[in-house]
């Protein structure tokens, strides 16, 4: 395994943890008790539903792209010569949080994965048990300060990027874009980065927003990178 951190600014500025979700959303009526009831208690009482589907992946021509929403923020992006996973998480439980919809396909039905994009270190997006089980050696691309969490998870290469920094390999390119969120996995690691990605390959540009609230940066991403497809798992939490 080789770990390739960002090549400039070895100490990116830290963003303090938000004091509440009010700092991440225009809503001014956030209530922690309501959030706990809706996201935890109500979920416990709700039967899990949805069905796994055995995928019939299409035959693609150069320039074609197939995108499968697995669930939550997880997507499978396929080209003729490249299989990409974004924020893969196949778990039915995440601590107290219950998954209400089964993942759209089973982990064992995935094709060999060439590239994994991880938008930030939160447990529902950077799910270590899932990452350990992914088929085939792979490249992992993630924001600054997250690479240490990826050690020992089977990645052949680990790439960390700063905002607006790009990494190219073969004939594909990925750029880390800003988002309105935060990156800490615990209360003591606010140095970790966060963002979204624009993936460019075979003339296509695909944008995954990460775990972002709405912000003016969407306009800047559109101006600078002009993605043609946007994957917006906003509100998935």
Task: Name each model-derived stretch.
Residues 1-94, 98-109, 142-208, 228-235:
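Metallo-beta-lactamase
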Residues 24-27, 96-142, 157, 224-231, ...:
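Active-site metal-binding motif and surrounding structural segment of the metallo-beta-lactamase
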Residues 54-55, 72, 101-106, 126-129, ...:
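A generic local structural motif
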Residues 77, 87, 120, 127, ...:
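Divalent metal-coordination and catalytic microenvironments
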Residues 93, 122-126, 147-149, 165-168, ...:
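Active-site environment of divalent metal-dependent phosphoester hydrolases
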Residues 104-111, 167-171, 188, 219-224:
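Short amphipathic alpha-helix with an adjacent loop that forms part of the alpha/beta core around
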Residues 129, 181-237:
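Active-site-proximal loop/helix segments of hydrolase catalytic cores
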């Amino acid at each position: 395994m080789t770990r390739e951190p960002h090549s400039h600014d070895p100490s990116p500025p830290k963003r303090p943890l938000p004091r509440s979700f009010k700092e991440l959303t225009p809503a001014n009526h956030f209530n922690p008790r309501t959030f706990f009831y809706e996201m935890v208690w109500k979920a416990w009482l709700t039967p899990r539903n949805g069905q796994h589907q055995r995928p019939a992946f299409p035959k693609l021509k150069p320039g074609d792209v197939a995108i499968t929403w697995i669930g939550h923020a997880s997507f499978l992006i396929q080209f003729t010569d490249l299989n990409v996973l974004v924020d893969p998480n196949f778990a039915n439980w995440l601590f107290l949080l219950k998954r209400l919809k089964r993942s759209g396909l089973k982990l064992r039905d995935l094709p060999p994965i060439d590239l994994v994009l991880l938008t930030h270190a939160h447990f529902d997006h950077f799910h270590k048990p899932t990452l350990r089980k992914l088929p085939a050696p792979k490249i992992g691309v993630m924001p600054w300060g997250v690479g240490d969490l990826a050690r020992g998870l089977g990645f052949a290469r680990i790439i960390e990027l700063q905002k607006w920094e790009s990494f190219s390999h073969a004939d594909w390119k990925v750029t880390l874009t800003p988002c309105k969120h935060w990156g800490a996995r615990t209360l003591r690691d606010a140095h970790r980065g966060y963002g979204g990605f624009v993936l460019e390959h075979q003339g296509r540009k695909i944008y995954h927003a990460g775990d972002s609230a709405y912000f003016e940066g969407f306009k800047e991403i559109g101006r600078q990178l002009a993605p043609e497809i946007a994957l917006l798992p906003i509100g998935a939490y």
